[in-house]
């Protein structure tokens, strides 16, 4: 397999704060990843000097995190590792205070979640207790459409690799993930030590009783022994090239001698020079002159690509971050007058009722929206209504809500365009709720601007 032929997949690592997420992720990146040996040796030396030798993998990760949080643009390759089949990017490990927001507006949808559970006495119980963040993160992943899961039972060395303990944990965890919505039969359970490396890349000699993991999905039956093999058995994502174009703008630049250059990540569809695109909710239509990525011209940009594209006769004042570009001839994007969404309240101290108007983060847009009407309260797991027209909802509740944006914004139903159909509700400087959009009432188009070049291109 040539270097270029491997599929890229994204994983998100979830679990309780002390489950060993950093150590486990650090180990994978360390052994199969983009951290060059020099950096590692530097980190190891620092760790040893500070008496943190026992944390070496986590230390590597902490260094990367610290640099990333200080805004030093850290080489993102450091968060990647390679398996025989895939290039894997670790999207964001929780614990990061913006984890939830990142997971929703995040640069990408995770293809699989890796749930890390600590086997130590008391640790496991704390991790999946009722108020545990583990439950919250797992539910969040599931609600946001992450349908594949791997469970790694970590710190097996602290449980002396006892088979009985492992079986007990598997039984409990199976019930736990079933309640969240995952099917345990389709999940690989792997006993590991993220620190010592058991069953990470090579089978451990410490658990002769362990015959390997197995999972059964629509695609068939898979078996293996290590965490790496479990990651390799993730089903590859179908990238949405066949859908109409949706490209939320991250920035719009004015470049001397070239003109206006919007920049963003293609979420669905393709973008090619010569295409006529419409920006919503600005309602501007124009022709794309050129498309480039990493300073190279592209014949075609695809989902996942972060591109800049040059548009003709459009000023920087007319389009902005949060606008969405789409193909003017194929389901062009439009502003939303209102939308209904399933909203899950996560950590709001009080009650939320009609009239609440927090800020929504949806793709690159950041706009206040009013909870106009609480239509029904629903059971998070089954999606069935439990109460119609509730007066209030509080933490832990889920409801179908009609929402009205305070100013024009472009969103879509989650089933049509997932990245444009999930949002975080921010208030008091934290994520207080998350939502998945069910339906959108598009606004009747205001006066539209169509540039001359677009009109000319349309006649061709």
UniProtKB/Swiss-Prot annotation:
Q: Which domain of life is it from?
A: Eukaryota
Start and end residues of each stretch annotated as G2: 71-75
Task: Report residues binding GTP.
Answer: 15-22, 92-96, 154-157
N6,N6-dimethyllysine modification, residue list: 3, 317
In-chain residues carrying the UniProt-annotated modification N6-methyllysine: 3, 317, 391
Q: Which residues form the signal peptide?
A: none
Q: Report what the protein is called.
A: Elongation factor 1-alpha
What is the source species? Answer: Hypocrea jecorina (Trichoderma reesei)
Q: Gene symbol?
A: tef1
């Amino acid at each position: 397999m040539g270097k270029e032929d491997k599929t890229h997949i994204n994983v998100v690592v979830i679990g309780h704060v002390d489950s060993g997420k950093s150590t486990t992720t650090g180990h994978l990146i360390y052994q199969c990843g983009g951290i060059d040996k020099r950096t590692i040796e530097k980190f190891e030396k620092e760790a040893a000097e500070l008496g943190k030798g026992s944390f070496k993998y986590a230390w590597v990760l902490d260094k990367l995190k610290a640099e990333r949080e200080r805004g030093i643009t850290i080489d993102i390759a450091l968060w990647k590792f390679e398996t025989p089949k895939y290039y894997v990017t670790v999207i964001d490990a929780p614990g990061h205070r913006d984890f939830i927001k990142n997971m929703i507006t995040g640069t990408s949808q995770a293809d699989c979640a890796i749930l890390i559970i600590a086997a130590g006495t008391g640790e496991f119980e704390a991790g999946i207790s009722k108020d545990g963040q583990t439950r919250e993160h797992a539910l969040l992943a599931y609600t946001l459409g992450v349908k594949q899961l791997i469970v790694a039972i970590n710190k097996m060395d602290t449980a002396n690799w006892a088979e009985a303990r492992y079986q007990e944990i598997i039984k409990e965890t199976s019930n736990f993930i079933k309640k969240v919505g995952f099917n345990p039969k389709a999940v690989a359970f792997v006993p590991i030590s993220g620190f010592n490396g058991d069953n990470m890349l090579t089978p451990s000699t410490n658990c002769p009783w362990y015959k390997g993991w197995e999972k059964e999905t629509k695609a068939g039956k898979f078996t293996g022994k290590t965490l790496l093999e479990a990651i390799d058995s993730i089903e590859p994502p179908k990238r949405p090239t066949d859908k109409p174009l949706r490209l939320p703008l991250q920035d719009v630049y004015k470049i001397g001698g070239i003109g206006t250059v919007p920049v963003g990540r293609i979420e669905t569809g393709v973008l090619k020079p010569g295409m006529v695109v419409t920006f919503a909710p600005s309602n501007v239509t124009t022709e794309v002159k050129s498309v480039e990525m990493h300073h190279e011209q592209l014949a075609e940009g695809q989902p996942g690509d972060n591109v800049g594209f040059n548009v003709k006769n459009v000023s920087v004042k007319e389009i902005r971050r949060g606008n969405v570009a789409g193909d003017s001839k194929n389901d062009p994007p439009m502003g939303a007058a209102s939308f209904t969404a399933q909203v899950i309240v996560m950590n709001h101290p009080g009650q939320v009722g009609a009239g609440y108007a927090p800020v929504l983060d949806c793709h690159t847009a950041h706009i206040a929206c009013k909870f106009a009407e609480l239509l029904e309260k629903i059971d998070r797991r089954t999606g069935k209504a439990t109460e119609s027209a509730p007066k209030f909802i509080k933490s832990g509740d889920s409801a179908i809500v009609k929402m009205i944006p305070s100013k024009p914004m472009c969103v879509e139903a989650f089933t049509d365009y997932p990245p444009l159909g999930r949002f975080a509700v921010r208030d008091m400087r934290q994520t207080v709720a998350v939502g998945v959009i069910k339906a959108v009432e598009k606004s009747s188009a205001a006066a539209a601007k169509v540039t001359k070049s677009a009109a000319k291109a349309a006649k061709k």
